[in-house]
C-alpha cells in the first residue's frame, strides 16, 4: 500500500519531496498554487522540470495535486463558473508541468439551483476542462464530499452520474474516509457494503486515490473536519479494516490530517502500525 501525505510547499516543491523522503513515504500530495487565491504568478517551468526530474528519480508513485478551494464547477452563476473553468484549466496545466498523476477536485456546490442542475453544470465544466487540455495526461479525480450545505458528491450516485456524462479516461475518483463517513456511508460496521455500493454506482475501476483521515464529526453529520488517525469517530479498528481491505490496499493512501507541520510523523506511524504485512 503506497502511503503519502499532503505536505506544504511554502519552502518549495523540492522541500516537500525531501520531507516525504524523510518520513519514508511512498507518494505525495501538494498544492500547485495557493488554494485560497484565484490569481497566482506563472509556474517557473525550469523549476517545474527540475522538480519533475527529482520526482521521477525518487521512485515515488503517484504524485497527487489538489486544486483551489475557490473553484466551483457546478455554480449556477455563469461568470463564476467560467472563472472556475479557467482556474481549473490552469491547475491541470500546472499539475502536468510538475509531473502529477492526479489532480483532486471537489464536486462543487449547486447553491440552491438544485442537485440535478448542479450535476449538469459540473459535467459540462469538466468536459470543457478536459477538452481544452486534451494533449495532457494528468487525471482529474472527483472527491467524495461530506455533503455540507449544497455541496455535491456525497451520494455515490452524484459522481456516478457525472462519470457517465463526461465519459473520459482522464476522469477518476478520490475516496476521502472522513468525507464518506460524514456523508453517512457507514465504513465502520458496513465497509463491505459501502465498497459494494461504490462499485455499483461509480465503479472500483474508477477509484484512483484514497484520502485517509479520521473524523471529528458523527456518522452522517456532514461535518468536514479531519482528525488524527485513530483518534476520531472512525477509530483505529475501522482504519485498520480500510487500510488492509483487499479491494483498497493497492491504492495510494494520502493523509490530510491536522497540524501537518508538527503531527504528520505521528499520523504516519499510526498508519504503519495498522498496516498488515
Give the residues covered by each predicted segment.
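Conserved, mostly hydrophobic/aromatic
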Residues: 20, 66, 84, 95, ...
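N-terminal pre-domain/capping segments
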Residues: 1-67, 71, 75-93, 277
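Active-site beta-loop-alpha junctions enriched in small/polar residues
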Residues: 6-10, 33-35, 67-70, 108-110, ...
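C-terminal helical cap(s) of enzyme catalytic domains, especially alpha/beta-barrels
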Residues: 261-277
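Acidic (Asp/Glu)-rich catalytic clusters
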Residues: 18-24, 44-64, 91-99, 127-135, ...
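Active-site acidic/histidine proton-transfer and metal-coordination neighborhood
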Residues: 56-57, 73-172
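Alpha-helix N-cap and loop-to-helix initiation/capping positions
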Residues: 39-47, 76-87, 113-124, 150-158, ...
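Acidic/histidine-rich catalytic cores of soluble enzymes
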Residues: 28, 123, 128-227
Amino acid at each position: 500500500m503506497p502511503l503519502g501525505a499532503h505536505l506544504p510547499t511554502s519552502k518549495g516543491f523540492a522541500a516537500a519531496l525531501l520531507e516525504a523522503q524523510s518520513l519514508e513515504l511512498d507518494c505525495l500530495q501538494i498544492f500547485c498554487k495557493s488554494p485560497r487565491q484565484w490569481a497566482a504568478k506563472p509556474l517557473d517551468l525550469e523549476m517545474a522540470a527540475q522538480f519533475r526530474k527529482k520526482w521521477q528519480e525518487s521512485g515515488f508513485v503517484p504524485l497527487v495535486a489538489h486544486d483551489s478551494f475557490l473553484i466551483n464547477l457546478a455554480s449556477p452563476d455563469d461568470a463564476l463558473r467560467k472563472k472556475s473553468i479557467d482556474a481549473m484549466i490552469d491547475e491541470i496545466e500546472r499539475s502536468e508541468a510538475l509531473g502529477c498523476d492526479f489532480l483532486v477536485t471537489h464536486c462543487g456546490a449547486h447553491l440552491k439551483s438544485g442537485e440535478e442542475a448542479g450535476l449538469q453544470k459540473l459535467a459540462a465544466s469538466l468536459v470543457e476542462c478536459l477538452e481544452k487540455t486534451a494533449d495532457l495526461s494528468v487525471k482529474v479525480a472527483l472527491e467524495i464530499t461530506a455533503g455540507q450545505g449544497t455541496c455535491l458528491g456525497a451520494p455515490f450516485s452524484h459522481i456516478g452520474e457525472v462519470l457517465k456524462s463526461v465519459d473520459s479516461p482522464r476522469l477518476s475518483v478520490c475516496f476521502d474516509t472522513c468525507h464518506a463517513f460524514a456523508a453517512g456511508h457507514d465504513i465502520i460496521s458496513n465497509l463491505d457494503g459501502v465498497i459494494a455500493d461504490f462499485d455499483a454506482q461509480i465503479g472500483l475501476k474508477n477509484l484512483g486515490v484514497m484520502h485517509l483521515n479520521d473524523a471529528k464529526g458523527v456518522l452522517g453529520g456532514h461535518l468536514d473536519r479531519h482528525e488524527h488517525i485513530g483518534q476520531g469517530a472512525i477509530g483505529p479498528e475501522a482504519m485498520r479494516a480500510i487500510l488492509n481491505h483487499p479491494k483498497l490496499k493497492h491504492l495510494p493512501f494520502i493523509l490530510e490530517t491536522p497540524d501537518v507541520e508538527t503531527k504528520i510523523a505521528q499520523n504516519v506511524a499510526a498508519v504503519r502500525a495498522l498496516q498488515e504485512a
